[in-house]
């Protein structure tokens, strides 16, 4: 029964924090420290598959459009009206490549992330969200796909650090480069799909070496909860982004850091 409660909490946190700009990795690290458990790799994989499934459902039509354009490109049948979608595909490809290099580098040092460093990263995320809702300088660089992809990919790679919100930092970078909020949201979450599947491939070997702390039922339960909560969270994030209310998350992170620092 204790394990059931744990997977419910972990699934809920993953579903909330993966989509809202508050860092799922940072929150899960806090939970692991305070619950005194190490997440088995298979459970981590299931949680991420659940959340990426949310993105694929939310952007189902958009993904099908991009796949169709890609097929037309391979067959040499693209038209002028397909160029915008091809640019988006190229942008996501560049972002994915840059993110992968930086993410692999950060993964090598993930065991060195202390609680204090995670709290500092929470503060950094809070500042970025505050700046996103402020009158920050906008650079009109979105037409330069290579430069934009490299910069956004770099930010998304940094987002692999626990406490740094991947969605928050990529949306911040995209808006800074001149993309609209809706475009930035789309870029952030469409680029999540190849990154998650790529990271799962890298963890494939570990899957057979990890201990089964949770039962199959408990693992599936956690994934289902992460999926259902994620469906709600992604819609909530869209609304709050459109309404310019991301400062709520900025305040939340400062409160969280204060509570953890002074109480623990």
From Swiss-Prot:
GO terms for molecular function: undecaprenyl-diphosphatase activity. The chain crosses the membrane at residues 7-27, 39-59, 89-109, 112-132, 145-165, 182-202, 212-232, 244-264. Its EC number is 3.6.1.27. It is found in: Cell inner membrane. It is a multi-pass membrane protein. Bacitracin is thought to be involved in the inhibition of peptidoglycan synthesis by sequestering undecaprenyl diphosphate, thereby reducing the pool of lipid carrier available. HAMAP family: Undec_diphosphatase. This is Undecaprenyl-diphosphatase. It comes from Borrelia hermsii (strain HS1 / DAH).
